[in-house]
């Protein structure tokens, strides 16, 4: 595009462009062309303006009745408003300009050489940013000491933090770079920036961040925004999902001029913020909907998991109950087999029933718990344990039982105990030749 623009220039304009670049040492051809256009291709006025700007001396020419305003057309996405310096007027002005021109060129050439050499010896201390917040707060304090407390609300944070907040809040961010050595900075701050109408306008429409270019943080931002002169204001906003400079205001402006230009930039770019806000709301709604769907899915998943857990728990409980029932059944069957084996063993070990006419015969009738009667003969000399073993060997006898006499009622000690280690004989127990004994079930005791 630069080559196309150069082809659009006349031969005379091209020669002036190259001559101006040689005199000022500006590397950017676009900047040289812009400066010449601001001065209506008056090379003497353009060179004088550039030298005055670098030197920081007061203006030597009177202000014109109307300040020419320039719009940067190199990039149609960025609106540029530049207040150009006045051209020399009259013989006195041109005479002073022509006399001072060689001295200024020599002075600034030597100054540039000195600065270039000094850069290798001692790097610019502003290039090291160690406390960006401190730089901003320090500038605010110095600003209020010099210009008072009536001013737009300064963002008390770093440039990066201001960018992030403007992005998050979808607001315009106005950046002011304060050139302390520039002759227009004091006038701008005192008579434009700190006026009530400008203060109210900025506070109600945008975030406002400012810093001096003499501070490391301000110098770093200056390197990024690449301002041409002071005062400098840059309007930044979220555009196409990136923080973009959409407006550049340079030079001394009156309050109403500043408000008009800021209003123009806002109105020209408001649709981008509205579009971004709608997209963000749509993304938020989509995110909320997705979150609600995820929550509903999680609720359903938890319900299914709880249902599955209860099902498994019920199955596990049923399995344990079945295993416990099987275990008890096996124990019961084993116990039953052991009892049957014990009954059979006791039956095999019983002494033979004595004959009816034996002199020591004892006839005993047992009344069982189920009401049946069992009769058998024993000998007086036999132990009561024989009676117990006989009853134990019977199928209808319960597992645990005791033998009780009818009158007087007493329990016969048929099994060994601590008190009676050896059970007595039938005779010692006081049984008669014909005896009725009761068998009591002790299984449930």
UniProtKB/Swiss-Prot annotation:
Reading the lineage from the top rank, the first entry is Eukaryota
Please provide, alphabetically and separated by semicolons, the GO molecular function terms listed in this UniProt record.
Answer: protein-macromolecule adaptor activity; ubiquitin binding
Q: Where is this region: Disordered?
A: 302-354
Q: Which Pfam families match?
A: FAF1 (PF21021), UBA_8 (PF22566), UBX (PF00789)
Under CDD domains, the record lists: UAS_ETEA (cd02991), UBA_FAF2 (cd14414), UBX_UBXN3B (cd16120)
Q: Where is the UBA domain?
A: 12-53
Please give the InterPro entries that the UniProt record associates with this protein.
FAF1_2-like_UAS, Thioredoxin-like_sf, UAS, UBA-like_sf, UBA_8, Ubiquitin-like_domsf, UBX_dom, UBX_domain-protein
A cellular component term, taken from the record's GO annotations: endoplasmic reticulum
Annotated PANTHER family: FAS-ASSOCIATED FACTOR 2, FAS-ASSOCIATED PROTEIN
Q: What does this protein do?
A: Plays an important role in endoplasmic reticulum-associated degradation (ERAD) that mediates ubiquitin-dependent degradation of misfolded endoplasmic reticulum proteins. Involved in inhibition of lipid droplet degradation. Involved in stress granule disassembly.
How is this protein named in the record? FAS-associated factor 2-A
Protein's organism: Xenopus laevis
Protein's gene = faf2-a
């Amino acid at each position: 595009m630069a080559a196309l623009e150069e082809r659009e220039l006349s031969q005379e304009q091209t020669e002036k462009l190259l001559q101006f670049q040689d005199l000022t040492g500006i590397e950017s051809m676009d900047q040289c062309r812009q400066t010449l256009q601001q001065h209506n291709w008056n090379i003497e006025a353009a060179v004088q303006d550039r030298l005055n700007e670098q030197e920081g001396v007061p203006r030597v020419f009177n202000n014109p009745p109307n300040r020419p305003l320039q719009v940067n057309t190199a990039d149609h996405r960025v609106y540029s408003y530049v207040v150009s310096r006045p051209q020399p007027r009259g013989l006195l002005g041109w005479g002073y300009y022509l006399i001072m021109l060689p001295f200024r060129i020599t002075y600034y050439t030597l100054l540039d050489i000195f600065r270039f050499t000094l850069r290798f010896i001692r790097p610019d201390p502003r290039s090291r940013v160690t406390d960006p917040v401190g730089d901003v707060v320090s500038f605010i304090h110095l600003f209020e000491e010099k210009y008072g407390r009536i001013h737009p609300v300064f963002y008390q944070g770093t440039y990066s933090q201001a960018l992030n907040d403007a992005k998050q809040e979808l607001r315009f961010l106005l950046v002011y770079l304060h050139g302390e050595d520039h002759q227009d900075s004091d006038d701008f701050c005192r008579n434009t920036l700190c006026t009530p109408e400008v203060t109210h306008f900025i506070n109600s429409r945008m975030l406002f961040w400012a810093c001096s270019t003499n501070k490391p943080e301000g110098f770093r931002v200056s390197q990024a925004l690449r301002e041409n002169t002071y005062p400098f204001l840059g309007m930044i906003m979220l555009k196409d999902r990136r923080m973009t400079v959409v407006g550049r205001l340079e030079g001394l402006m009156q309050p109403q001029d500043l408000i008009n230009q800021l209003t123009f930039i806002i109105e020209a770019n408001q649709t981008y913020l509205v579009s971004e806000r709608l997209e963000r709301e749509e993304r938020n709604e989509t995110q909320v909907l997705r979150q609600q769907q995820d929550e509903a899915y999680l609720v359903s998943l938890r319900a299914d998991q709880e249902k599955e857990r209860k099902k498994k728990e019920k199955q596990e409980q049923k399995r344990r109950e079945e295993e416990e029932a099987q275990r008890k059944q096996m124990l019961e069957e084993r116990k039953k087999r052991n009892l049957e084996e014990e009954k059979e063993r006791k039956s095999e070990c019983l002494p033979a029933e004595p004959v009816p006419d034996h002199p020591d015969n004892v006839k005993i009738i047992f009344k069982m718990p189920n009401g049946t009667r069992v009769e058998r003969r024993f000998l007086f000399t036999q132990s009561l344990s024989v009676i117990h073993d006989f009853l134990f060997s019977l199928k209808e006898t319960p597992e645990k039982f005791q033998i009780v006499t009818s009158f007087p009622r007493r329990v016969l000690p048929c099994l060994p105990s601590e008190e009676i280690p050896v059970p007595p004989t039938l005779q010692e127990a006081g049984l008669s030749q014909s005896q009725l004994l009761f068998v009591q079930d002790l299984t449930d005791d």
